[in-house]
Amino acid sequence: MSKVSKTAMPAGAGRGAAKKELPEHFKSYKHVWVFVELERGQVHPVSWELMGTGRGLADRLKVNLAAVVVGPEGQHTRNAALEAFCYGADLAYLVSDNVLSDYRNESYTKALTELVNTYKPEILLLGATTLGRDLAGSVATNLSTGLTADCTTLDVDADGSLAATRPTFGGSLLCTIYTLNYRPQMATVRPRVMPMPARVMRDAARIVVHPLGLVEDDIVTKVLSFLPDRDAETSTLAYADVVVAGGLGLGSPENFRLVRELAALLGAEYGCSRPLVQKGWVTSDRQIGQTGKTIRPKLYIAAGISGAIQHRVGVEGADLIVAVNTDKNAPIFDFAHLAIVSDAMQLLPALTAAFRARLLPDSRARIAV
């Protein structure tokens, strides 16, 4: 169904004779769709990030960009469809029904599958969130098409095929994957992998309302109660402007307090590399990298982190990366903007003291006394 290039290559490279003529019944599939994730009345930011990426793909293909909004009847759902036009949508598809009040795989899969079969997009993008991953897999299965998960780059090749690049083999390789002979071409992207596009006020264009035709008795799964994710309420790591993170170079779990102290002083979020989660030093909601969170802060300070590719793919969107490591050959220095060869155990307290003196001059006076 999907073809994988063995190494990261330019879009379209390495396919050769493997590409077959697209079956006739798929040639009518046109346009780029982005699924707008709406939960508890709020649009997940990854949806707007994907709208920016989708806009670029649609422009290169010379087709329309459409937003797909699925949710309960009411103003929140319609507002999400209207807001999509401010992020580049040419039209929006709206499925609004009270059986969609809570996310359930059965009802949402039916809604999105029906939309695809009726209006036939060539590309369908979803956020790689808990909801998006669950929905994308079931929709791709229903449609018997390919799905590339957790992409880091999306492009179109000279033939107009979607070239979806993602890490593989534990992050040691980047593979470009094509869904050659099936439609739609589906991909998911994690939050913060793509930049947030500028919001531009635009008049609403066309909204296509599609009836669901599903009643509550048709759905096996019932939602009895909703418990908010504790981590989602207490951590804003993925969308923080400043992030301080630590790795194994800190030496012990007790020393991780140096990361927390600097982050607290800067009003920043703190994170860590995967080994610290594996050792139980830090909870998994603070992990940064391929299997954790992707971040795009204005400033990222990495202390005692080697910078393997699994970590790199989660941080390389940062505006400024400051890396601290005792090993001058550490991989993180290959992509850091500022490399400091030093012991994090000595540098972090010095940085904290310097920032405290600069940001809190009263504390400097008290120390002098």
Curated annotation (Swiss-Prot):
Entry coiled-coil feature ranges: none
Keywords: Electron transport, FAD, Flavoprotein, Nitrogen fixation, Transport
GO biological process, one term: fatty acid beta-oxidation using acyl-CoA dehydrogenase
GO molecular function: electron transfer activity; flavin adenine dinucleotide binding
Alphabetical list of SMART domains matching this protein: ETF
Cited SUPFAM superfamilies: Adenine nucleotide alpha hydrolases-like, DHS-like NAD/FAD-binding domain
Residues in the signal sequence: none
Residues binding FAD, per UniProt: 299-327
Gene3D superfamilies with a match to the protein in the record: HUPs, TPP-binding domain
Subunit structure: FixA and FixB form a heterodimer.
Function: May play a role in a redox process involved in nitrogen fixation.
Family: Belongs to the ETF alpha-subunit/FixB family.
Protein name in the entry: Protein FixB
Organism: Bradyrhizobium diazoefficiens (strain JCM 10833 / BCRC 13528 / IAM 13628 / NBRC 14792 / USDA 110)
Name of the gene this protein is made from: fixB
